[in-house]
Amino acid sequence: MRKYFGTDGIRGRANGVITPELALKVGQAAGLLFQRGEYRHRVVIGKDTRLSGYMIETALVAGFTSVGMDVLLLGPMPTPAVAMLTRSMRADLGVMISASHNPYEDNGIKLFGPDGFKLSDEVEHEIERLIDSDLQKRLSASADLGRAKRIESVHARYIEFAKRTLPRNITLDGLRVVVDCANGAAYRVAPETLWELGAEVIAIGTEPDGFNINRDVGSTAPDALVRKVRELRADIGIALDGDADRVLVVDEKGQRVDGDQLMAVVARSWKEDERLTQPGIVATIMSNLGLERYLGGLGLSLVRTAVGDRYVLEHMREHGYNLGGEQSGHIIMSDYATTGDGLVAALQLLTVVQRQKRPVSEVCHCFDPLPQVLKNVRYGAGEPLRKDSVVTAIEGARQRLGNAGRLVIRPSGTEPVIRVMAEGDDRDLVVEVVDEVVEALRKAAA
């Protein structure tokens, strides 16, 4: 059982879970662990636009410099940009201060190794051990303390990186694009990238004030984007989340396109171009069965993992896949990036749109998603999933669905909630089986 790290770094309420004291210790512990050899060591630190980012950034700088690491400060930058710059700047470690799609009150600390990948469970466990040790005995001597420096050219570096993921013969000339940056980390780089590639860009969610990240904007709240696309008769809307590692698209009719549909478009395109390194893609247990059937019709498989982009990426790396993602919009393209990158994923979709010279609505809706119902059951103490009545209800629900659907029962990794999801060809049956399982869980949790 891990004490500090969850499935996506350390995350919680700022000045509640994520305190200056904890951030200081994380900096010291990670700094000690990633010092190898006698040369000067350095860490890059990026953040999103939350008010608490200043506090956490300052505490991390104190932690890293106190154990002799030099710090390169990037300011507000997307998570995938931090991962890319960690590699590009030959840093020993990368840090992103963000709570992704959560409200401004929360914040988090994500760590990347020198290769730009998120740290393994084993390395995170070792950092936890060091956090709880006597770090005062391992501080650097006065003459060996680290320095901190703010880097000014990082936006241009990431913009050039993102542009290079587009084939050289493809431009975005003639496209009217609305991009929603969620008042988050991509508020500068995303509109600039799209404009430099030739698009007419209308940007919303680009006025961060420390409090408005993800508030009624971004990939988890796309209504504002839908309205703007319809109002301006745009060709496409692109919604990023607070740290820009996920994306949701809106077509010219205002219809939403989720991560499953985006993966379907890219998978088909890459199969035709013989770019897939394996005959399939990697997704999670939450991806729609319609995606699996669509890929099967193309001769491609869908491998499922636990929920979380880190598990998708782990399977991709272990088994040689170069495309994977989540329904929520984390799209991982390992030819380009070591983590989900919302802007790069959107550019790959736009590549297909420009090549085919068809509207986004015709390119994107590759399959009809099966009816899917998701409900959450909150519980107190105990383990309701172990109760006989719940086990019986789950078994009965799966038997009723048979081969015409799926049932997924998943405890949340961040709160005392059990998620019940079912999908199938018959919507009425899907609703019934979810309600039966939810009722059994509520009685068991009472």
Swiss-Prot record:
Gene3D superfamilies: Alpha-D-Glucose-1,6-Bisphosphate, subunit A, domain 3, Alpha-D-phosphohexomutase, C-terminal domain. InterPro entries: A-D-PHexomutase_a/b/a-I, A-D-PHexomutase_a/b/a-I/II/III, A-D-PHexomutase_a/b/a-II, A-D-PHexomutase_a/b/a-III, A-D-PHexomutase_C, A-D-PHexomutase_C_sf, A-D-PHexomutase_CS, Alpha-D-phosphohexomutase_SF. One of its GO terms (cellular component) is cytosol. Keywords: Isomerase, Magnesium, Metal-binding, Phosphoprotein. It is an enzyme of class 5 (isomerase). It catalyses: alpha-D-glucosamine 1-phosphate = D-glucosamine 6-phosphate. It comes from the Bacteria. GO terms for molecular function: magnesium ion binding; phosphoglucosamine mutase activity; phosphomannomutase activity. The active site is at 100 (phosphoserine intermediate). GO terms for biological process: carbohydrate metabolic process; peptidoglycan biosynthetic process; UDP-N-acetylglucosamine biosynthetic process. Binds 1 Mg(2+) ion per subunit. Mg(2+) binds at residues 100, 241, 243, 245. This is Phosphoglucosamine mutase.
